């Protein structure tokens, strides 16, 4: 996918030599061929295995009373874990540019416009390698919950995430005028674009054939 190697054994050998001791996919199934072709040595494989199992033993995975085998289901989505998840989400936010806009003061705002294909899309929240939560809160829902009845919240999807129209019988850009109207009637606009797991993920980005991406005019692609 990255055009660095030409075969799977070459990829496996390169990864092992660069210190990648474990692979969750199927690339390391080609390590034997890489060894037979002289791309790696038995010592390379032994070193990776020793480091991997040293870590697993230090974590206690092979202890007689391994704590990971006795985690009760009751702790799933418990208040403590939800609080930790929320804290992790807060700390992971990256603010690239502000110019004094944030934080928003709802006491000074009468109308908030929320625009974008990911503004009210749960698929954009879950990523890949995910479990199933009992509740999802989209950006639109989060803003609505926070401001309550104090601030009016307008919403426009604006565009489809990767098609040129939202409605099958619509014309290209069929929701763009709605987005413009929402923006004109809002004191501040929260624009939510980006991708979701239908368009990006492990070994997916390179083969994305729909040409999707963020465009200044909301027309995707």
Annotate each PLM feature.
Residues 23, 42-43, 64, 154:
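A local structural micro-motif
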Residues 1-6, 14-26:
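Short acidic/histidine-rich active-site segments
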Residues 77, 81:
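Metal- or metallocofactor-binding catalytic centers and their adjacent structured scaffolds
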Residues 1-10, 29-42, 54, 83-221:
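C-terminal non-catalytic regions of proteins with extracellular/luminal or membrane-system context
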Residues 18, 37-38, 59:
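Residues at alpha-helix termini
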Residues 69-76, 111-115:
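Charge-rich, acidic-biased intrinsically disordered regions
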Residues 50, 54-74:
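Conserved, charged catalytic cores of large soluble enzymes
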């Amino acid at each position: 996918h990255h055009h660095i190697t030409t075969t799977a054994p070459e990829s496996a050998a390169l990864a092992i030599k660069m210190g990648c001791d474990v692979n969750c996919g199927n690339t390391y199934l080609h390590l034997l061929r890489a060894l037979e072709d002289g791309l790696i040595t038995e010592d390379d494989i032994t070193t990776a295995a020793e480091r991997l199992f040293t870590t697993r033993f230090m974590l206690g995975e092979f202890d007689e009373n391994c704590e990971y085998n006795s985690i009760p289901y009751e702790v799933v989505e418990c208040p403590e874990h939800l609080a930790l998840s929320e804290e992790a989400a807060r700390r992971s936010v990256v603010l690239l540019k502000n110019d004094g806009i944030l934080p928003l003061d709802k006491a000074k705002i009468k109308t908030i416009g929320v625009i974008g294909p990911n503004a009210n899309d749960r698929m954009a929240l879950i990523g890949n390698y995910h479990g199933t939560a009992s509740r999802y809160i989209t950006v639109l829902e989060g803003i609505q919950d926070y401001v309550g009845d104090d601030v009016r919240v307008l919403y426009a999807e604006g565009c489809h995430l990767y098609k040129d129209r939202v409605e099958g019988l619509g014309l290209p850009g069929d929701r763009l005028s709605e987005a413009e109207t929402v923006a004109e009637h809002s004191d501040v606009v929260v624009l939510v674009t980006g991708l979701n797991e239908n368009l990006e993920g492990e070994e997916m980005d390179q083969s994305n054939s729909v040409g999707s991406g963020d465009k200044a005019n909301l027309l995707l692609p």
